[in-house]
């Protein structure tokens, strides 16, 4: 924020601050700014998610699920963090230097240590996994066999629900020592906190599925969509219906969010294995595991790599190419589909389609964030700043995702201007609505380059 804007805030704050202090004792922040009960619950969940340590080692849910990085972490983002960030607690807390994390694999490949089969034999009974994002969960959690959370679909204890997920996360990642004793090493979330955390997580990202095919304009992305939807060629839509996390109606494997053994564990020369660090095989769902892993949504994929449960593949093109690999085609899932055989240009086309729908989702989120900003006056300034910072990050993602595939340079230019305008809005107190409205217009211009206006 500029020095002049800082001066203006102080100058105009005196009277409102007095009124604010008179009433704050009887109104929580959530109640004051979010009179709707569900909105207040979501806001409380947000504050817990990013600030509550549960009397543990200093980590919060937001330590690994970063709002500014698509609710996940990756090596490039990790490299920007200071050495005293709670993510690196195993490096500076002597009680957690053994059997809690592997700092080398975390920093180099974005992997965290999970004891999904229990906390006996900590030295051997573990796996190294990437951090999944927590976006669009209303569309991805439910299955015929119950809720699916985490990479293998069994990430939550007790009833396996999203609400219960935080219980397991606190015990796994927040503990002060490997003993994991409630009261001494951490406290579990209360029922009210679990309700709020669930509400917040369910509010993140898409609330409904796409309806494919979309009226895309880009030649390569349009071809990629056709391959994606073709049940004889790409076969993608059978398990990622509408590019989501659920099986297509009539899928012989079942309905809803399904688990599959796709052979990712059988990939040769996985990056983390090349280090010589201990990497026990990951047996997936259950204890002992059955080798299956959960189906993720693909709308959010292009800007949330690396890919698969072990971060084995860096790029979206590489992730699509995996389904041509013997590891997939000889797996139970690949055998059940009769194999997939795409040529190099078809792989690029499917990846282009995934890049475009990801950028379109970023634009949708940005417009939503911008339209929700600039309406709270002085007391909502900080909340506006959070929204605008998020919009800036999402705009950067959209630009990078498109540019990374050489797609829609005109849209990239519009997004660059939208980002500049959003930054101006974030540094302006009284004229911000002007910049916000112009940024929204630029996002719509970018979207119009990629997809027909009637959509």
Q: Which residues does each predicted region cover?
A:
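N-terminal secretory signal peptides that target proteins for export/translocation
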Residues: 1-9
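Sec-dependent N-terminal signal peptides
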Residues: 11-20
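N-terminal signal peptide c-region/cleavage motif recognized by signal peptidases
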Residues: 23-25
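Periplasmic c-type cytochrome electron-transfer domains
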Residues: 29-455
């Amino acid at each position: 924020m500029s020095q002049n804007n800082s001066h203006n805030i102080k100058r105009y704050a005196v009277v409102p601050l007095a009124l604010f202090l008179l009433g704050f004792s009887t109104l929580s922040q959530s109640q004051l700014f979010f009179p709707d009960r569900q909105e207040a619950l979501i806001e409380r969940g947000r504050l817990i998610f990013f600030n509550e340590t549960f009397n543990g080692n200093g980590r919060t849910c937001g330590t690994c699920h970063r709002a500014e990085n698509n609710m996940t972490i990756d090596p490039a983002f990790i490299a920007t963090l200071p050495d005293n960030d709670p993510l690196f607690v195993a490096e500076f807390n002597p009680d957690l230097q053994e059997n809690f994390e592997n700092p080398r694999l975390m920093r180099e490949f974005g992997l965290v240590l999970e004891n999904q089969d229990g906390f006996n034999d900590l030295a051997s009974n573990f796996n190294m996994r990437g951090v999944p994002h927590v976006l669009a969960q209303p569309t991805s959690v439910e299955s015929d066999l119950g809720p699916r959370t985490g990479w293998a679909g069994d990430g939550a204890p007790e009833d396996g629900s999203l609400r219960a997920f935080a219980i397991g996360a606190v015990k796994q990642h927040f503990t002060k020592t490997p003993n994991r004793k409630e009261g001494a090493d951490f406290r579990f979330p209360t029922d009210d906190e679990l309700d709020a955390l669930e509400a917040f997580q369910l509010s993140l990202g898409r609330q409904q599925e796409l309806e494919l095919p979309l009226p895309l304009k880009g030649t390569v992305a349009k071809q990629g969509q056709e391959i994606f939807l073709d049940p004889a060629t790409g076969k993608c839509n059978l398990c990622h219906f509408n590019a989501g996390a659920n099986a297509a109606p009539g899928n012989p494997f079942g309905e809803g969010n399904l688990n599959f053994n796709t052979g990712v564990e059988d990939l040769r020369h996985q990056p983390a294995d090349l280090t010589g660090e201990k990497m026990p095989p990951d047996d997936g769902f259950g204890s002992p595991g059955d080798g299956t892993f959960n189906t993720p949504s693909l709308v959010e994929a292009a800007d949330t790599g690396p890919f698969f449960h072990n971060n084995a593949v860096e790029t979206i093109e590489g992730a699509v190419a995996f389904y041509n690999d013997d590891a997939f085609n000889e797996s139970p899932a690949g055998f059940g589909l009769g194999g997939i055989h795409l040529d190099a240009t078809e792989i690029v086309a499917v990846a282009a389609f995934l890049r475009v729908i990801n950028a379109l989702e970023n634009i949708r989120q940005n417009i939503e964030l911008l339209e929700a900003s600039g309406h709270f006056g002085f007391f909502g300034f900080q909340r506006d700043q959070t929204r605008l910072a998020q919009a800036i990050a999402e705009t950067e993602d959209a630009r990078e995702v498109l540019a990374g595939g050489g797609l829609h340079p005109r849209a990239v230019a519009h997004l660059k201007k939208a980002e500049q305008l959003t930054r101006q809005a974030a540094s302006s107190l009284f004229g911000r609505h002007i910049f916000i409205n112009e940024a929204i217009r630029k996002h719509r211009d970018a979207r119009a380059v990629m997809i027909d206006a009637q959509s």
